[in-house]
Amino acid sequence: MPQNADSVLDHENLFRQPEYRELFARKKEEFEFAVPLDKVQDVAEWTKTKEYQQKNFAREALTINPAKACQPLGAVYAAVGFQNTLPFVHGSQGCVAYYRSHFSRHFKEPTSCVSSSMTEDAAVFGGLNNMIDGLANALSLYKPEMIAVSTTCMAEVIGDDLDSFIKNAKDKGSVPAEYDVPFAHTPAFVGSHVTGYDNALKGILTHFWDGKAGTVPALERKPNERINFIGGFDGFVVGNLPEVKRIFKLMGVDGTIVCDPSEVWNTPTDGQFRMYSGGTTKQEVIEALDAKATVVFQEFSTLKTAKYIAEKGQEVVTLNHPMGVAGTDQFLMELSRLSGQPIPAELELERGRLVD
């Protein structure tokens, strides 16, 4: 029901009106990927049982990786997978400190990421000045080829518009007008780290394929026989992606790994610090549009990205991680079908040894 001067509802009652209930329900269905309410209730009841109590108190590990983190953490993961790219989180320093420490603890490698250092004044008046100064400082200090921007709760609650802010920052001379600054809105109070990974990856592809926020013409797809591969939000990426690359090479498949953080989180101890290492190049991202198909691991890590790629005319094959013989067989057979290449004897030999 619309507000008017004669009948102004308090927020507690306003948000109970039918139009708001419908809006919240649609948001939950389309953006939060929520499970059914009866399932939520079942789990809630289970947490009150003796079984859950015993399971909860039986933990022995001092440190447990969270099963669910917030969107910007996933966005940082996605940004790290591109060559010479600096993740830039529009929000407070404390949030970014958490993302860096989380990844560094897990991979035992330093993780580079910066923030726009929003504080109380930015929370009230908006973070445009923080974006202007932050982009300029990031480019000057760390010399990335690309800065991938995401957001935290603070920026999203006040409604900061990344597209507008980045264009204003370029107008102010923070970075050159032609400099690549892909972005994605990643509100931490919706979804999880896999949602943020999905949003950020789609944001980077959209930036290059759809005309860099309207500043250049959109790319026209010219199909070829290449195969793209997206591994999803993978905590074992430093071992899994090199194996995927080996399989592509053994089969003679001409392919592109879209988002490859396997090197930056697996640098050698040789006395040299590498802020950037490996990753998908900008040219590879551009050429990925023309690929015949894209193979995706972890369906729920890339719901929006997979849909976007399919809308561009590519075949998208979504698989679970190929754990075990059956899963690996499915991956290899799909790769063979898409590429027209036979499965090599070396891989058949490895399979035989495993079965034996």
UniProtKB/Swiss-Prot annotation:
Entry protein name: Nitrogenase molybdenum-iron protein beta chain
GO cellular component terms, A-Z: molybdenum-iron nitrogenase complex
Function description: This molybdenum-iron protein is part of the nitrogenase complex that catalyzes the key enzymatic reactions in nitrogen fixation.
EC code(s) of this entry: 1.18.6.1
Source organism per UniProt: Herbaspirillum seropedicae
Keyword Phosphoprotein: no
Transmembrane intervals: none
Cofactor annotation comment: Binds 1 [8Fe-7S] cluster per heterodimer.
Any Pfam family hit: DUF3364
Cofactor list: [8Fe-7S] cluster
GO molecular function: ATP binding; iron-sulfur cluster binding; metal ion binding; nitrogenase activity
Disulfide-linked positions: none
GO terms of biological process kind: nitrogen fixation
Additional notes on this entry: Ala-188 is present instead of the usual Ser that would serve as a ligand for the 8Fe-7S cluster in the oxidized state.
Gene (name only): nifK
